[in-house]
């Protein structure tokens, strides 16, 4: 299949609307403001999920780290919404682009590191040299710890990109195989279609899990620097 070289730079659309608008509006549609005195079951489940996620991520933080609560909740909702919208047919998944994921990972990582150097300068510098290190190994360990620090945003972005891209490729390949097998063997095509359905369900779980993992790792980086 031939594609335009610059197709990845065009604004992705869905039903004629820019997908950015749908991504921004998706959390507000999924989690509307309650207008009842007593919440219904759906609203109660939504609030329980938000409280559970907040508790998992913020229980390890002190007061300084808990000021990032709104940022972390917004981040997991944004990534989760983007991943789920990307599973719709004929849609574009922005989180398959390494440039976008780096654009999220680098500022968040840099913010946690700057916070650590501002409020815990000695403790942040101490991470570069573990206590009790032999004198001949000091230069090597400082270099290794520095490299590991700068690899963190790359690991965040590559993990999210690789998992989402791999899932979409598998769905595309198995879907194409199902269409090709329909003219050859109906039974084999049906079995492949069942596998495709199961893989799609798995991708829904992966979309949410990857959003949680990305946000959790940012939360852990923040915990190390506050």
UniProtKB/Swiss-Prot annotation:
Subunit a, of the mitochondrial membrane ATP synthase complex (F(1)F(0) ATP synthase or Complex V) that produces ATP from ADP in the presence of a proton gradient across the membrane which is generated by electron transport complexes of the respiratory chain. ATP synthase complex consist of a soluble F(1) head domain - the catalytic core - and a membrane F(1) domain - the membrane proton channel. These two domains are linked by a central stalk rotating inside the F(1) region and a stationary peripheral stalk. It is found in: Mitochondrion inner membrane. This is ATP synthase F(0) complex subunit a. Its main location: mitochondrion. Keywords: ATP synthesis, CF(0), Hydrogen ion transport, Ion transport, Membrane, Mitochondrion, Mitochondrion inner membrane, Transmembrane, Transmembrane helix, Transport. It catalyses: H(+)(in) = H(+)(out). One of its GO terms (biological process) is proton transmembrane transport. The gene is MT-ATP6. Coiled coil: none annotated. One of its GO terms (cellular component) is mitochondrial inner membrane. It is a multi-pass membrane protein. CDD domains: ATP-synt_Fo_a_6. PANTHER family: ATP SYNTHASE SUBUNIT A. The chain crosses the membrane at residues 12-32, 68-88, 97-117, 138-158, 164-184, 189-209. Belongs to the ATPase A chain family. One of its GO terms (molecular function) is proton-transporting ATP synthase activity, rotational mechanism. Component of the ATP synthase complex composed at least of ATP5F1A/subunit alpha, ATP5F1B/subunit beta, ATP5MC1/subunit c (homooctomer), MT-ATP6/subunit a, MT-ATP8/subunit 8, ATP5ME/subunit e, ATP5MF/subunit f, ATP5MG/subunit g, ATP5MK/subunit k, ATP5MJ/subunit j, ATP5F1C/subunit gamma, ATP5F1D/subunit delta, ATP5F1E/subunit epsilon, ATP5PF/subunit F6, ATP5PB/subunit b, ATP5PD/subunit d, ATP5PO/subunit OSCP. It comes from the Eukaryota.
